[in-house]
Amino acid sequence: MDRRTKIVCTLGPAVASKDAIRRLVEDGMDVARLNFSHGEHADHEQNYKWVREATDETGRAVGILADLQGPKIRLGRFLDGATVWETGETVRITVDDVEGTHDRVSTTYKNLAQDAKPGDRLLVDDGKVGLICREVDGNDVVCEVTEGGPVSNNKGVSLPGMDISVPALSEKDIADLRFALKLGVDFIALSFVRSPADVDLVHEVMDEVGRRVPVIAKLEKPEAVDALESIVLAFDAIMVARGDLGVEVPLEQVPLVQKRAIQIARENAKPVIVATQMLDSMIENSRPTRAEASDVANAVLDGADAVMLSGETSIGVDPHNVVRTMSRIVQHAETDGHVPPLNHIPRTKRGVISYSARDIAERLNARALVAFTTSGDTARRVARLHSHLPLLVFTPDAAVRSQLALTWGAETFLCREVTSTDEMMKVVDESLLAMDSYQRDDMMVVVAGTPPGVSGNTNMIHVHLLGEDVRR
């Protein structure tokens, strides 16, 4: 595989057909994102089916990610649908259910008057409009407009620095989570994570449904930045969701949060996605800005497992051009750039084995690293090292293969169950010698666990020549 960093594409009206989704797969989409902030369950179900059909037809492993809306706080509705707040004006945000006027509008967050205090900031529509609380008057929060602009029905409201009392999962999120699990998605992304304990609520619902899949923590809140290391440990992967993050924390901090998050995720062998406005201008244009190209390349050079497209593919004028453009930028960054080495000394058996396998393969100038895995853990531990060698991953579990679509560099093969090391090598020979890329006697460094099939039991490195008789 020429490109090692994976691409996540958000599905939406711009690609709402089987042919369009198949073309995304052919263009290079590795993970399809179902955004539950928009669309009906029927829309997501249809897109899910089209992705699975496309993967069956093309043979590519593509994961499917269900992104939950989270407890998003919004304004209510205006009598006229919209208004313009001018800087210096006084407006009231109320917890009462009222039809909004220019001077007073409701909010979906019914504890606002209880939680707000003078001096707190309220940011509307991703920070385009700024307010500051001057006083709390009964059920109303009286605000001065510090940065004016247009506001309209149901615009989002961010409350940076305010200690808000909302659950990690709304009723809508729970319903969407149940639906997505029954549908068969490969990942769940949890929005507005504040604490490592937030994952427990998701697991409770998963256990009720009877199906667990990896949970991705979206870094959007200051609390998540403060608890970053413990959140990385608790969750299965993380997403640096720079849109809401850039509203909730000072904008100048976002690049360093991104770099720190990627570093911590790599140290813990957890996949990390960099998201939001990566090629945003391509929603309307055929070419990205130079700054956007640099942004994508820098995410690659930071060591991200994946980069994500949002509106660019869901509502953009040419989603296929966007994916191809991102793929070219990524490939060039990988070819001519340099990802800093992981300066992390492994302390576990699995970590030491993975490091050693990489070192042996590179010192012997092997053709590839090969990982056998039942859970994906072995592959992720090797992938985080970003070797220049191909990483070929064999698994008997179709779900694990789909989940590894998010892991840097993992080229996956679905194989039969094996019961011995000899069988492993036979599977490698059968699969790779059938490809034009590999020849008999090519050296492979295989990392796996014995006995095979035991999750988390990485304990073996085997230097194998393709086609050799492994029996002694």
What would you call each of these model-derived segments?
Residues 1-472:
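Non-catalytic helical/linker scaffolds that mediate oligomerization, partner binding
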